[in-house]
């Protein structure tokens, strides 16, 4: 699974580099931003 650094676009099949899931201001909307 690819990881996205904080602040970059994060897709359903990606996770943040810290091992957390993608977070965004909109729920269930992709792509979203990796905030954590």
From Swiss-Prot:
Tell me which domain of life the UniProt entry assigns to the organism this sequence originates from: Eukaryota
* Keyword Disulfide bond belongs to the record: yes
Q: Which tissues does the record link to its expression? A: Expressed by the venom gland.
Location in or out of the cell: Secreted
Any coiled-coil regions, as ranges: none
The Gene Ontology terms for molecular function here are: calcium channel regulator activity; ion channel inhibitor activity; toxin activity
Signal sequence annotation: none
- Which keywords does UniProt give here? Calcium channel impairing toxin, Disulfide bond, Ion channel impairing toxin, Knottin, Neurotoxin, Secreted, Toxin, Voltage-gated calcium channel impairing toxin
The cysteines covalently paired via disulfide bonds are 3-17, 10-22, 16-34
Task: Name the residues that span the membrane.
Answer: none
Under InterPro entries, the record lists: Huwentoxin-1 (IPR011696)
Instruction: Cite a GO CC annotation.
Output: extracellular region
Give a short account of what the protein does.
Answer: Neurotoxin. Causes spastic paralysis and death in mice. Moderate inhibitor of L-type calcium channels (Cav1/CACNA1).
Q: What does the record say about domains?
A: The presence of a 'disulfide through disulfide knot' structurally defines this protein as a knottin.
Q: Name the protein family.
A: Belongs to the neurotoxin 10 (Hwtx-1) family. 53 (PNTx27C4) subfamily.
- What's the protein here called? U4-ctenitoxin-Pr1a
**Organism in which the protein naturally occurs:** Phoneutria reidyi
């Amino acid at each position: 699974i690819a990881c996205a650094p904080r602040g970059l676009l994060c897709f359903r099949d990606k996770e943040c580099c810290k091992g957390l899931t993608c977070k965004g201001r909109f729920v269930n909307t992709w792509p979203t931003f990796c905030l954590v």
